[in-house]
Amino acid sequence: MPTWLTTIFSVVIILGIFAWIGLSIYQKIKQIRGKKKDKKEIERKESNK
């Protein structure tokens, strides 16, 4: 396996791990904020119809 291939492979894995961690943190923040905003957003959607 050429060195450039292993380098690309490791970079992709590292980026994937960072993206996965970032998404999990983002979803937790979204859930915390979502609990507060859910009621307001539902009321807005119903009033827009």
From Swiss-Prot:
It is found in: Host membrane. The keyword Transmembrane helix applies. The chain crosses the membrane at residues 5-25. GO terms for cellular component: host cell membrane; membrane. It holds the Pfam family TMEMspv1-c74-12. Keywords: Host membrane, Membrane, Transmembrane, Transmembrane helix. It is a single-pass membrane protein. The keyword Transmembrane helix applies. Belongs to the plectrovirus ORF12 protein family. This is Uncharacterized protein ORF12. The lineage of its organism: Viruses, Monodnaviria, Loebvirae, Hofneiviricota, Faserviricetes.
